[in-house]
Amino acid sequence: MPPTPRPDPGPPAPGVDPFQEARRDDCPWCGSRRLRTMVRAPEGPRRTPGTFVVDECRDCCHAFQNPRPTADGLLLRHHRHPTEGHIRSNLAGRLRRRHHRTAARAMLPYIEPESWLDVGTGHGYFPEAAREVHPYTAFDGVDPTPRVERARAAGRIEEAYQGLLTDPEITARLRARYDVVSMFHHLEHTADPRAELRAARTILRPDGHLLVEVPDPARPFGTLTMVPRWPGRAHDRPRPLHLMPLRNLLAELRSLGYEVVATRSCAPFPPRAHRIIARRTALPPAPVAPPPDPSAP
């Protein structure tokens, strides 16, 4: 599928950073204004232009980049991911492949999928590994970069969609099409995790399953996923846009019409992560307003 067309916003206004939005003074998850700064880094060599600050909500413990990158900043970040050869050759890549097979096996007790969409698939390494566990499943992939087309050309996925899962054109085309949707360390890199979960529900078939892995901010090294760690990259921009406490994410899944069937801690190496399996159910009934009080003036 060709990339989803986007309108040209034109040149930015004077004094406007094309790679960063305006700083916000409330939590993107619960709306609280009780924020504290966890990380503040100066400018320097980095993955995307601009400085960065990581704030945490004192009420719901949601951590997020503030200000966050614009759509152009996110696209620049996606294009600077490691190369295919580098991912293949290092130890982390080999551990990740083994971890992918384990994650694919996690679905065996719940469903025999005919169709599976991997969101943020990149080079398509998860579908390639998962096919060893589910040989009769058709794996497709969606990713904002041309890597997804190369994954299709390499035979790791059957259909490739270049763009975002939340793009209306992609969501409409894939509506109720998949038995499983997977998101491996994808939600924390998106501008709006809630929108991603809603889009995933749209493209799942009734009783389809969502498989999610996200960093665990409550474990050792959890918050360090927001902070540079590699020697010689003292000011690299941190990758995740959000760190979501497990209780927040589970509550959101249930409110969107998912039944959480399994959660566990997992990761091939630090930082630790949560794996969540949720089944698509009917949306919960809308809250009914209480009847008017006849005694009220």
How would you label these PLM feature ranges?
Residues 2-184, 193-197, 264-266, 272-277, ...:
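Conserved N-terminal segment of class I S-adenosyl-L-methionine
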Residues 139, 210-212:
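Hydrophobic/aromatic residues located in beta-strands of well-ordered beta-sheets
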